[in-house]
């Protein structure tokens, strides 16, 4: 059943809001039935809040945790992204966060090199630039499967990986060894392998940073990078791995805070030309589209530092998930005001909420509260330890 997971979720994401139940599989019909009453009971503000994912810090102090709890409880957001902590504190944070909401949260993590990137007891896999030295992509698939096992044991639904940026100039590029390197075919092959491993294991993978952060000298955390090349280059290099992963069934794409002058005068993450016209329509991506973190300077800069205005612009561009907006309450208010009682905008909102709820339903988050609790005793790091050892030995043998 796990090998059919990615096929079922992509089908749900693409068609749940529009296809009659008779045309869906049994699993999809169950998810659709779970979603319908949830959406019908929601106000417009409730629906917008489902598109907002906020950060939680299991290793943070009590004051920070209290602030995060307050936002989750008050706004009833749709998901969380886990930051640094250990297994016990992360489990406690997940369980407490779930207890604060009526509609269960999607739980996500930025684990480019496994859970060890955020959870202290796990070893870290080598960076993607190092993994590019493996003789083939077989171990990349196994790595994806093991990451999924680890994440499912902690009830984590989404991993914001792999990075499929093509890094043509590693000496000056900000992505550096987060990328598989300068060969677009290897980036696509290895990125697809780890993506398929995760999704076959029941975790949603996320290709990033669309349309390509691999040839930029500026860090989008600090300023707005500019991709200064023609459409032909963008299409043949930067977009190539994304096109491959979309073909291979990736369920989520993260849009970066990147300025692409040949496409638009706005950053990609807030550009309808990039998000809707290019990714959704031209490249025919039917899955979930998420922004990079909305508190980064690369996206705040064009809006005079206003996180709420940047978040509204991202919504207008067509993204499904708004990641880590600076001011959650104000951001939701602006989007609700923008939608108003416009029937077309309300229908579009329902479609986006349906995609987010379909993610939760397919990951088992809508079946009952017993399925939400994380048990630290059920988490085992041995599988990761063994696989990392195998990977390191394989890399050493190839030198």
Task: Indicate residue ranges for each PLM-predicted region.
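Bacterial N-terminal signal peptides that target proteins for export
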Residues: 1-8
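Preference for extracellular/luminal or secreted protein segments
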Residues: 2, 21-70, 272, 281-282, ...
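Hydrophobic h-region of N-terminal signal peptides that target proteins for export
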Residues: 13-21
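Second-shell residues forming the walls of enzyme active-site clefts
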Residues: 43, 80, 89-105, 115-117, ...
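Short glycine-enriched loops at secondary-structure junctions
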Residues: 56-60, 107-117, 157-167, 207-213, ...
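A short aromatic-anchored loop/beta-hairpin motif
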Residues: 73-87
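Active-site-adjacent structural elements in enzyme catalytic domains
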Residues: 87-104, 137-155, 354
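A substrate-binding/cap region within the structured catalytic cores of diverse enzymes
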Residues: 133-156, 161-191, 195, 199
């Amino acid at each position: 059943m796990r090998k059919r997971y990615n096929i079922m979720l992509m089908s749900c994401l693409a068609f749940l809001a529009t296809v009659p139940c008779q045309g869906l599989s049994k699993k999809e019909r169950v998810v659709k039935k779970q979603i319908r009453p949830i959406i019908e009971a929601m106000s417009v503000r409730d629906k917008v809040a489902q598109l907002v994912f906020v950060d939680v810090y299991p290793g943070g102090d009590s004051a920070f945790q209290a602030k995060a709890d307050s936002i989750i409880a008050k706004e009833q957001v749709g998901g969380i992204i886990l930051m640094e902590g250990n297994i016990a504190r992360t489990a406690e944070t997940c369980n407490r966060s779930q207890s604060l909401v009526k509609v269960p949260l999607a739980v996500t993590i930025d684990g480019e090199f496994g859970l060890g990137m955020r959870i202290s007891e796990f070893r870290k896999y080598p960076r993607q630039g190092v993994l590019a030295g493996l003789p083939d992509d077989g171990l990349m698939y196994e790595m994806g499967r093991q990451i999924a096992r680890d994440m499912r044991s902690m009830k984590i639904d989404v991993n914001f990986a792999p990075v499929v940026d093509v890094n043509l100039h590693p000496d000056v590029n900000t992505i550096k060894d987060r990328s598989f390197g300068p060969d677009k075919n290897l980036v696509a092959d290895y990125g697809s392998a780890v993506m398929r491993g995760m999704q076959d294991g029941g975790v949603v993978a996320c290709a990033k940073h669309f349309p390509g952060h691999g040839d930029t000298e500026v860090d989008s955390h600090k300023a707005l990078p500019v991709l200064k090349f023609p459409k032909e280059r963008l299409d043949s290099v930067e977009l190539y791995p994304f096109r491959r992963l979309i073909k291979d069934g990736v369920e989520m794409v993260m849009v970066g805070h990147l300025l692409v002058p040949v496409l638009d005068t706005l950053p990609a993450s807030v550009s309808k030309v990039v998000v809707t016209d290019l990714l959704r329509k031209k490249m025919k991506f039917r899955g979930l589209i998420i922004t990079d973190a909305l508190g980064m300077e690369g996206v705040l800069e064009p809006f005079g530092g206003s996180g709420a205005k940047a978040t509204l612009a991202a919504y207008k561009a067509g993204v499904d998930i708004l990641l880590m907006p600076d001011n959650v309450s104000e951001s939701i208010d602006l989007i609700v005001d923008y939608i108003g009682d416009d029937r077309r905008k309300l229908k579009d909102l329902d479609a986006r909420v349906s995609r987010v709820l379909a993610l939760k339903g397919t990951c088992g988050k809508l079946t009952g509260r017993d399925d939400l609790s994380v048990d630290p005793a059920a988490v085992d790091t041995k599988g990761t330890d063994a696989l990392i050892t195998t990977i390191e030995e394989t890399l050493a043998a190839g030198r």
